[in-house]
A protein has these predicted regions:
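Short loop/turn segments that flank or connect secondary-structure elements
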Residues: 1-148
Length: 148
């Protein structure tokens, strides 16, 4: 397993269709890429103003950062590998793993459907988010006037 894969490779990884014989009980064992350990989803406040979206533009301008909205709200999706992931996709600190890892459930995870496909909105670049902002705010280009 290549823990230094780029974001494009990671997107292809999560877009893969799972085998049909996968159940909740055997899903983690069939996930050879440790998909859940290759990204972080950080919930963010719902962006409402031009200033909020301008800040998101700055964030999504960085490598391996996406912004998405789903039924649970808005999130930053950060592609980054867990430093404890060993070759073969197993956790190197399993007995001492953080609580968030212990609470994680595989009832429905990226092995079933990629976050990108399950999202209502998905922005992987400045260009895509700015296009959305121009539609959402009629005076989007005038947002810089607040800084004058």
């Amino acid at each position: 397993m290549d823990l230094n894969m780029n974001a494009k490779d990671q997107i292809e990884l999560v877009d893969a269709t799972p085998p049909s014989n996968v159940t909740i009980d055997n899903k983690c064992g069939k996930c050879t890429k440790s998909i859940c350990c290759n990204s972080i989803n950080q919930k963010i406040p719902t962006p409402k103003s031009k200033e909020d979206f301008d800040h998101l533009l700055w964030q999504v301008s960085h490598e391996n950062i996406n912004v998405f909205k789903d039924a649970d709200g808005w999130f930053l999706h950060i592609f980054t590998n867990c430093s404890h992931l060993l070759p073969g996709g197993v956790c190197g600190i399993y007995e001492n793993r953080p609580w968030v890892c212990r609470e994680y459930t595989n009832d429905f995870c990226e092995f079933d459907e990629s976050i990108k496909d399950a999202s209502e909105l998905w922005f992987s670049s400045h260009k895509k988010l700015e296009k959305y902002c121009r539609k959402r705010f009629k005076k989007w280009k005038k947002r810089f006037e607040i800084y004058k």
